[in-house]
A protein has these predicted regions:
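Membrane-interfacial helix-loop connectors
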Residues: 1-4, 8, 25-41, 181-260, ...
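Transmembrane helical segments that form the transport core of multi-pass membrane transport proteins
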Residues: 94-229
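Predominantly late transmembrane helices and immediately cytosolic-facing juxtamembrane segments
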Residues: 46, 50-75, 83, 144-154, ...
Length: 309
């Protein structure tokens, strides 16, 4: 499950904005939807190394189990696999469409006022719920409601579905988002004066902070910082022009190093909670950190040498 978190919950989501929230933030600020396909070489490089490591670890564990007499029982017929609830694919498409619309609608004239700002509902002070964001929220909630109401309860029971993991992650990350705001505000105010001008510097700074401050707002802070450095060549966003190599470094730092801790990315803790509920032993917070330092950090050092120097 640790390597599942490494590869599926984090690194594997780098190819589109719907794969990981940091890239969605970039999409909403003018980065083309399919630009992140540029990260495919980095993804393949990391995936091959980590899958190779996993293969040898798994083979060693398998041989040890066989030596201890823990052989698989092949005398019983295998479990027949059925796919039920296929109509939920419709609701999944609704959610994907909502995410894509959240990045495309703000660029349309109908959603902008005379000053060029995105129209919305002012909540308090300078906080505004934009109409594209409202449409996204409504579409996702409608899809979730329809899925919940139209899916047979027996399917959820057989899948051992509970609200426990969702509740645990929601409470934890509400606390993280509240307590991280001062640190993010300091970074936003002083980011341009940090002296970060090289891709590898952005990769490691974005990544290290993403490990503990959640990768989505951290990505946005450093994308804003890069856009304010005054570059004239690269990707043009609403935050400024960012060199392609630096944009790749920020994107990979946020997405990949969100895997360094359970709190670097919400799905990490979700996987841990679901695993715990189903009796699968997972490392503690610092135990997981030891896994990531042992296996991920050396890979990220190789990333630096190959892609970001």
């Amino acid at each position: 499950m640790v390597f599942f978190i490494f590869l599926i919950s984090n690194i594997g989501g780098c190819l589109t904005p719907i794969g990981d929230p940091p890239l969605l933030m970039g999409f909403m600020r003018g980065i083309p939807f399919f630009w992140s396909l540029h990260l495919l070489p980095v993804l393949l490089f990391n995936a091959v190394i980590l899958l190779t490591i996993f293969y040898f670890l798994d083979r060693r564990t398998y041989r040890r189990d066989i030596a201890d007499g823990l052989k698989p029982d092949i005398s019983k017929p295998g479990t027949e696999v059925h796919i039920l609830g296929l109509h939920n694919l419709i609701f999944l498409v609704m959610i994907v469409a909502a995410v894509i619309l959240s990045g495309t609608l703000p660029g349309m004239e109908a959603f902008r006022d005379a000053e060029g700002a995105v129209r919305g509902i002012r909540l308090f002070g300078e906080v505004t719920l934009t109409y594209p964001a409202l449409i996204e929220i409504v579409m996702i909630l409608v899809a979730a409601f329809l899925s919940f109401k139209t899916t047979n309860v027996e399917i959820r029971r057989k899948n051992h579905f509970t609200w426990g993991a969702i509740h645990e992650v929601a409470v934890l990350f509400i606390g993280i988002f509240i307590t991280m705001q001062p640190a993010l505000m300091i970074l936003k105010a002083n980011g341009a004066s940090l002296g970060l001008s090289k891709p590898f510097e952005m990769f490691w700074t974005t990544g290290c902070l993403s490990s503990f401050l959640d990768n989505t707002p951290t990505y946005l802070v450093f994308l804003t910082t890069a856009g304010a450095l005054g570059f004239t060549e690269g990707m043009t966003t609403i935050l400024g022009t960012v060199p392609i190599a630096m944009l790749e470094a920020i994107s990979c730092g946020a997405v990949f190093m969100g895997a360094n801790t359970y709190i670097g990315n919400a799905p990490n803790f979700m996987v841990k909670s679901i695993s715990d509920e189903n009796g699968i032993r997972m490392p503690s917070f610092f135990g997981y950190l030891l896994w990531s330092v042992t296996f991920l950090i050396p890979v990220f050092l190789l990333d630096t040498l190959v892609f970001f120097l």
